[in-house]
């Protein structure tokens, strides 16, 4: 399943995503088993001596995986109750759980393979307003060939 998640920039966009090891879905809830590669570009410059997964990547991934597997075309309009609880480095395995509550709140929880919570929060969703803008293009402003 890894590598199947490509955004507007094809394979380059998928390089910014973790590998998907498994997916479970029940109702309006999804659980993704994920692993981030040792050479993933998301660690570039964050930080040279101690690579740490940026929090913004965790937010982005929750939105991308929810949208890809649910078919929901809405985009993120805001974030609430965001809490980062653990540093994540290259090669680590973790689970992302997403649950759609109410009509526009996506609750997410990242849990490390050792059971420790990594981060939690809520993404507020709204209808897509601009044609041609894809929420799975990472990093923002990145174009193919860069």
Would you name each region that the model predicts?
Residues 1-15:
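Polybasic, low-complexity association/targeting segments
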Residues 11-51:
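Catalytic strand-loop segment that frames the active site of acyl-thioester-processing enzymes
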Residues 14-16, 75, 91, 103:
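Short solvent-exposed loop/turn micro-motifs enriched in small/polar/acidic residues
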Residues 17, 90-94, 117:
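Residues that act as N-cap/strand-start positions at coil-to-secondary-structure junctions
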Residues 18-19, 25-30, 99-146:
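HotDog/MaoC-like acyl-thioester-processing domains
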Residues 34-36, 84, 125:
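Hydrophobic residues in beta-strands and at strand termini
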Residues 60-97:
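Hydrophobic beta-strand-centered segment that forms part of the acyl-chain substrate-binding groove
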């Amino acid at each position: 399943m890894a590598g199947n998640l490509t955004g507007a920039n094809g394979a380059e966009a998928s390089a910014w995503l973790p590998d998907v090891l498994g997916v479970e879905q029940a109702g309006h809830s999804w659980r993704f088993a994920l692993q981030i590669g040792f050479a993933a570009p998301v660690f570039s410059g964050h930080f040279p001596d101690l690579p740490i997964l940026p929090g913004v990547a965790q937010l982005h991934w929750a939105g991308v995986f929810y949208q890809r597997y649910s078919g929901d075309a809405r985009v993120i309009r805001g974030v609430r109750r965001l809490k980062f609880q653990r540093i994540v480095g290259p090669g680590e395995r973790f689970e992302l759980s997403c649950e759609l509550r109410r009509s526009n709140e996506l609750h997410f929880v990242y849990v490390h393979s050792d059971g420790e919570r990594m981060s939690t929060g809520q993404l507020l969703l709204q209808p897509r307003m601009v044609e041609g803008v894809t929420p799975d293009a990472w990093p923002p402003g990145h174009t193919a060939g860069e």
